[in-house]
Amino acid sequence: MSLKKIIDVKSVNTLLKKGIINKEGVRIIDCSFAVAPRPDWKEFEQEGYGDFKNLMAEPSPSRNLYLAGHIPEAVHVDLDIATYPSRYQRFQQYRADLFEEYAQMVGLNNKEHFIFYGKGAFGGMLFASKVAWIFKSYGHENISLVDGGFDSWKRNGFEVSTELVKLPAGNFKAEDNFKKYVITFQELEAKKDGEDKQFIEKTSEINFLDSRIRGQFDGTQETGLDPHLVNGTRIAGFKNLPSAELLVKGGNLKSEEEIKSWLTQNGYVENQPTITSCNAGIQAALLAYVIDAVKPSQNPPRVYNGSLKEMELRAPKKISEGPQHLPH
């Protein structure tokens, strides 16, 4: 089935009423996520890494959010199970062969179209876009993101379920498509033979987009960065395109033309490679998803999953622009 990359709740409701969800190659995926402190990565590595059966059996605040009310027929994908805490990243992606085990346990299949939605911040699209981008990086291209998320669904008066939806095990096969959709710290630091600049320093040739709110970028609001490690608020040469500004009041996305105009006004250059970042790779995924939807390209944006929280641990001097507070 051919569906747009961004879909409205009325279209989702039509699919539901026609009995298409979970029956005719379309799955709807609830991405409700309860933000929690970063788990101890060493402990998780020993006791939880890839143990999806036990992870899915444990109490889950995110699952509780899902069970409190969701779109009928929607299954839940938990970002804290789909990813794992590593030394440098809050949401590190598993190897493809491990991730597919989780996707199969949820009940997802290769040839299906996945519709992602969420609750809360950024019109419910913050964590939903992250999960959607994760699936893209594992080779699944048939995806849609629900504009306005669950709040929009409820505002329209559509049916809400509290049932735990369980599907038969799926046949989802994950591919390592990371090079197309995500970028690593090592790639950012790399230099090509004969070149003086690292990839991350080519800011005139590449759209390096910081998707945090302007106050964090400028240092007028708390950045979430460690002031003992970092003497700045942003990476030199990065442009600020806050994901929050993609939305109108009420939580829906701006029109496609408004988004295109906003991208240009904020320094986005057409046909340049694009890298998105934030603090932990979440807002960056929303910006990347929307750019990919309104400006489809053979070279889509790539998300820096580790973002500034990884950079402050591995190369803190890269975060050098903005207000300074440490002695030189």
From Swiss-Prot:
Domain of life: Eukaryota
Taxonomic source organism: Caenorhabditis elegans
GO cellular component: mitochondrion
Chemical reaction(s) catalysed: thiosulfate + hydrogen cyanide = thiocyanate + sulfite + 2 H(+)
Known EC number: 2.8.1.1
EC class: transferase
Keywords in alphabetical order: Repeat, Transferase
Active site: C278 (cysteine persulfide intermediate)
Family annotation (Pfam families): Rhodanese (PF00581)
Effect of deleting the gene: Knockdown and RNAi cause reduced lifespan. Knockdown reduced brood size and halved the production of H(2)S.
Name of the protein this chain belongs to: Putative thiosulfate sulfurtransferase mpst-1
Domain remarks in the Swiss-Prot or TrEMBL record: Contains two rhodanese domains with different primary structures but with near identical secondary structure conformations suggesting a common evolutionary origin. Only the C-terminal rhodanese domain contains the catalytic cysteine residue.
CDD domains according to UniProt: TST_Repeat_1
Keyword Hydrolase found: no
UniProt GO molecular function: 3-mercaptopyruvate sulfurtransferase activity; thiosulfate-cyanide sulfurtransferase activity
InterPro entries: Rhodanese-like_dom, Rhodanese-like_dom_sf, TST/MPST-like
Domain Rhodanese, first and last residues per copy: 22-162, 202-320
